[in-house]
Design a protein with these regions (language model features):
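N-terminal beta1-alpha1-beta2 module of alpha/beta enzyme domains
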Residues: 1-71, 179, 294-297, 301, ...
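N-terminal small/glycine-rich loop or linker at the start of catalytic domains
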Residues: 1-18, 74, 115-121, 160-179, ...
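Hydrophobic faces of well-ordered beta-strands that scaffold small-molecule active sites
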Residues: 3-7, 42-44, 76-79, 107-111, ...
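Acidic (Asp/Glu)-rich catalytic clusters
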Residues: 35-36, 65-74, 96, 100-107, ...
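Alpha-helix-loop-beta-strand connector modules within alpha/beta enzyme cores
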Residues: 55-78, 136-143, 147, 224, ...
């Protein structure tokens, strides 16, 4: 199992009162350090408002990833995830194809259907019910799959939420056979079926105890359509707000005060350590963990601790085979 790092962008208020240029420079500093320390992949996510409101600095993920593609030359890059509610799928595919060129074939295109109604309202996007948002995501996956696959014919699709007609996309993908497509989520009915039909990877957000059941259902969804379950990579997403036993968050807890009080009051046996969780996921055969690390805006120290935990858990770091 490999180690991916979710970079801070400001969604958790990490850059409150920061100059935006300094915030950008700090993100690049962290990305370069993570690459040197053996991180396999760097990830950004799509939020357009900070989690708890306010006017803190928050940087947009696609343009930030374009900068990362230039500034950080070796590690893989990905999204956890783009919000299809905000996006035209054909334009998303075109942007992804361009990013794959800029990065020399290092992009994983992560897609989801969004969950924050306040963000949609603020930007004037319609926030559909969950069932409809997932249907929209399915249509986006169909169009994008056609557009980012090398040597495919022009994309053509007519749906309820999106339509393209004989659409040529050049370049399509530096990678072969296509840009890898990731879906985020843990819904066993719709999300898992979309993963089986369209995706190269699914990024789950479940704890170690629930992982085996999720993988069992994923295997069923693949088998329903005649796909070998082993061809669908399974990874885990760990937000920086997730609490671990023995980890204080490096000065930025990424939680509301009431959440901090709840975690601090928990018994040591109620929470696994990060090493224990990562080792469990590795033993269950997951492809990678994609983790946020609290406190990175303020200090490099939490990143070094994270790297140590990854190594102790037996994760494969760049330049090392496990």
């Amino acid at each position: 199992m490999k180690a991916g790092l979710i970079l801070p962008q400001g969604w958790f208020g990490e850059f409150e009162s920061w100059d935006p240029i300094r915030a950008y420079e700090r993100i690049i500093e962290l990305a370069k350090l993570a690459e040197r320390l053996g991180i396999e992949s760097l990830w950004t996510g799509e939020h357009v408002l900070t989690k708890w409101g306010g006017e803190q600095v928050l940087l947009e993920c696609v343009t930030l990833t374009a900068a990362l593609a230039v500034e950080v030359p070796r590690v893989e890059l990905g999204f956890t995830v783009l919000n299809s509610t905000f996006r035209n799928p054909a334009l998303t595919a075109k942007m992804a194809s361009t990013l794959d060129v800029i990065s020399r074939g290092r992009l994983t295109l992560g897609l989801g259907c969004g969950f924050r109604e306040d963000e949609a309202d603020a930007f004037g996007y319609e926030f559909l019910p969950t069932k409809q948002r997932l249907a929209l995501l399915g249509e986006h996956l169909e169009i994008i799959s056609q557009m980012v696959t090398a040597d495919a014919p022009p994309a053509d699709f007519t749906g309820e939420y999106a339509t393209v007609r004989q659409l040529v996309n050049n370049p399509r993908s530096v990678q072969r056979p296509r840009i890898p497509i990731l879906i985020g989520g843990h819904g066993p009915n719709v999300t898992f079926r979309l993963a089986a039909k369209y995706c190269d990877e699914i990024n789950l957000d479940v704890l170690p105890a629930a992982t085996a059941q999720a993988r069992s259902v994923l295997a069923q969804r693949c088998e329903e359509i005649g796909r070998d379950p082993h061809t669908l990579a399974v990874s885990i997403s760990v937000p920086p707000s997730l609490a671990w036993r023995g980890l204080d968050g490096g000065g930025q807890r990424m939680m509301r005060p009431d959440e901090i009080a709840f975690v601090d009051a928990a018994s040591a046996t109620d929470l696994p350590s990060r090493v224990e969780a990562f080792a469990s996921w590795r033993e269950q055969g997951l492809s990678r963990v994609v983790a946020g690390v609290p406190g990175l805006a303020l200090s490099d120290d939490p990143l070094y601790t994270f790297i140590d935990d990854c190594r102790e858990a037996g994760l494969e770091m760049a330049g090392q085979s496990t």
